[in-house]
Amino acid sequence: MDAMTFDKLERALMNADRAARQFAKSEDNGTCNFDTPVIRIKATEKQMASLDYRVVKVGEKGWKDCWFVFIPLMGQGKRRTRMAEAAARSLIADGFEAGVYYQMD
């Protein structure tokens, strides 16, 4: 990943964090889940480790170049889902391929 892409990604992660926080005080009913934004980008683990946000490689087959994005998500039910979806929409708006990994407990 080149320096320009890295800077763009850092700004996009800050924007995603802000977008998610808009739902921080929303209703948190529903089932427990581990929904998390995911971004697809070619980068090394060393590059991603230097970001201000914790980003962890998804090691599963079919998830090539995908990374879990651990921005602060509050709650464990529908609030967490809304926050993860808002973060993913923000990453997409900033030009990255992103989505949400949905997992219920």
Regions found by a protein language model. Name each.
Residues 1-57, 62:
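N-terminal leader/targeting segments
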Residues 67-105:
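Short, compact, well-ordered microdomains
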